[in-house]
Amino acid sequence: MSALGTLSGGAAGVSGLLRLRRRAAPAPAIAAPSHLPAGTVKCAAAVPDAAPIVWGRQLRPALLLPAALLPSLQPARRHTLQPPAAAAESAGEAKSVGFLEKYPALVTGFFFFMWYFLNVIFNILNKKIYNYFPYPYFVSLIHLVVGVVYCLISWSVGLPKRAPINGTLLKLLFPVALCHGIGHITSNVSFAAVAVSFAHTIKALEPFFSAAATQFILGQQVPFSLWLSLAPVVIGVSMASLTELSFNWTGFINAMISNISFTYRSIYSKKAMTDMDSTNVYAYISIIALIVCIPPALIFEGPKLMQHGFSDAIAKVGLTKFVSDLFLVGLFYHLYNQIATNTLERVAPLTHAVGNVLKRVFVIGFSIIVFGNKISTQTGIGTSIAIAGVAMYSYIKAKIEEEKRKKSA
């Protein structure tokens, strides 16, 4: 209590702390460091080793030193090594993990959803256009025009940055683009001629043509298990074709031609493998395919369009809806193809193959619901068998490719 009374009565600044010492033998003087000027250490020897405790704190001689000199008398602080992540976190500089890196499964699911959604919307809107504007060559051309404009705008803003192209690469991409253009036109002729569900059922035969081309054109052995899985596809398409109410030879033949064209596109794509990213490759293919598709559109449909094609469509739905439908269907066509490519880059081939089969199921199912297409029982069974066969084929092929990659790794 006497100490506290002394502190309360005479503590005015640091000098008041000197009265709080016991009468004891003086401690040895603390020598000032050599780098400090004389007289900077004040009363260091006047405070004994057993300094008094005031309010739970022990007085130290350092309290009597100027604040600027305190660090020089303090012991060096040890720095412990920490892992980079822990060190950054302790300093408040930890890099925040973005949503895309934190939830990759959700992002992949979003890609699949957009792929299905855009594909279904494209097929439905495309068929609605053909119901009042039956000119598939011109509509196919519009698909590519909108896609090319989209690519040019993307290049202009650097999303993505345009990859340079030379004559050698142009020669490699031209056959791919030619097959892409032919397959695109014939697919649309088929979509315009028959029900969307039936056209996609016929297009389920594409793996059969791909296997045949691999075996007999490229000379590569196709495993027997793959051929066996294609049998349900052929049987299912045959059953569906025999009883399809919207069947006509124009739609059937053009769907088969598109299968062959896309098969050759795959073959030429393997020969034209480049280091260019998929977005730029698809952009260049779209530009070349657009040039390829202009002549047949002008030859087969140009005169009819100028005579009554445009005027009839505008009279039915109006100019605004006609133009907006063409723009949207072209945009959906380009985006769903681009998203499909981006999805393939994010997942394993097996996952993509299964997703592609499910996409066809979604398109067939939604087209039947939206357009109210009547299908016979045999057509429904045949379509189901064909889709199941494609799923089996895709699974076996992806497994074989995966085993090849593991062996080569």
From Swiss-Prot:
Residues 1-85 form a transit peptide. GO terms for biological process: monocarboxylic acid transport; transmembrane transport. The record marks 225 as: May be essential for binding and transport of phosphoenolpyruvate. It holds the Pfam family TPT. It is found in: Plastid, Chloroplast membrane. One of its GO terms (cellular component) is Golgi apparatus. Keywords: Chloroplast, Membrane, Plastid, Transit peptide, Transmembrane, Transmembrane helix, Transport. The keyword Transmembrane applies. Residues 126-137, 237-280, 400-409 are lumenal. One of its GO terms (molecular function) is organophosphate ester transmembrane transporter activity. The chain crosses the membrane at residues 105-125, 138-158, 216-236, 281-300, 379-399. Mediates the export of fixed carbons from the chloroplasts into the cytosol in the form of triose phosphates. In addition, it can also bind and transport phosphoenolpyruvate, thereby increasing the photosynthetic efficiency of C4-plants. Homodimer. This is Triose phosphate/phosphate translocator, chloroplastic. The gene is TPT.
